[in-house]
Amino acid sequence: MDRFVSTYTMRLDAKGRVSIPAPYRTVLAKDGTDLLHCHPSLAEPALDAGGTSLMAEIEALIARYPPYSEAREELAAALYGTTEMLRIDPEGRVVLTESLKTHAAIADQVTFVGLGHKFRIWEPERFRAHLAEAREKVRQLRRSLGSGSGNEGSISG
């Protein structure tokens, strides 16, 4: 299965378009879509994005709850209700809507971060801060598991 991996920082052009990194476009094409499904992250001041596989995962998550239950309605509103279907143009670009840009505080640059089954779109400075915090949490986790090897920059040690 193809995955979204690596990190890329790209500029928005004068028309507000941003190029999706070529490796990510390849994954989306193999997923059988020319649309980018994008919604405000539920966990971070960033955007979650992906193709039909991401939408299938969202559907599976929502389907765990009984129809018309409060939890199902809230998840559906938070995920389906805020997902934008962005058309990918022939040059591999999308236009982020104002509501998406506002949620993630995006102005003229974005950082794409692969998360395997999906990717996240960040304002670059916010991502740098998030990554520093995430690395510290991983170091603490490794120490708590007794796997600190002195090589704290590597997950595998």
Curated annotation (Swiss-Prot):
Gene Ontology MF terms in the entry: DNA-binding transcription factor activity; transcription cis-regulatory region binding
A single Gene Ontology CC term: cytoplasm
Record flagged with keyword Protein transport: no
Alphabetical UniProt keywords: Cytoplasm, DNA-binding, Repeat, Transcription, Transcription regulation
A GO BP entry: negative regulation of DNA-templated transcription initiation
Known partners and oligomeric status: Forms oligomers.
Protein's recorded name: Transcriptional regulator MraZ
